Amino acid sequence: MTGSATQGIKTVLHPVSDLEKAKAVYSALLGVAPMADESYYVGFEAGGQHVGLVPGGGPQGLTSPVAYWEVPDIEAKLTEVTAAGATVKDSPRDVGGGRLVATVTDLDGNVLGLLQDS
């Protein structure tokens, strides 16, 4: 196998129907207050992981949690995974701070996130 190795799961996004109630549950679970608390997104850092809550699935239309794998080169990784049979769901986009995200679906329809920090 050639290509670039991932650097592990960086972020897991969870679609939620009630952001305030979900924020309370995840604060209790993780034992920390949110580090980002907006009407469109609540994010936590705990144990070296980022956990995000997205009301109504957000612009990505999430219907289940999505793990975002950190990669050194998002375009190269997209080329590798699509050559292996994945389909691009959302092309790379900058979500702020130089962070690029994209999603693909595997052969069974599972959504996989890719994340590149600059």
Give the role of each language-model region.
Residues M1-K23, G48-H50, P65-A67, D117-S118:
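N-terminal beta-strand motif that seeds the catalytic metal site of vicinal oxygen chelate
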Residues L29-P34, G85-T87:
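Conserved acetyl-CoA-binding loop of GNAT-fold acetyltransferases
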Residues M1-A5, G8-S17, E45, P59-S118, ...:
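Vicinal oxygen chelate
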Residues E20-L29, A102, V111:
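Conserved active-site alpha-helix within GNAT-family acetyltransferase domains
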Residues H14, M35, P92-D94:
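Short beta-strand-to-loop elements that line the ligand-binding cleft
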Residues K23-A24, Y41, L78-T79:
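Short glycine-/small-residue-rich flexible loop motifs, especially phosphate/cofactor-binding loops
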Residues V32-P65, V111-Q116:
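Conserved short beta-strand elements that form part of the metal-binding/catalytic scaffold
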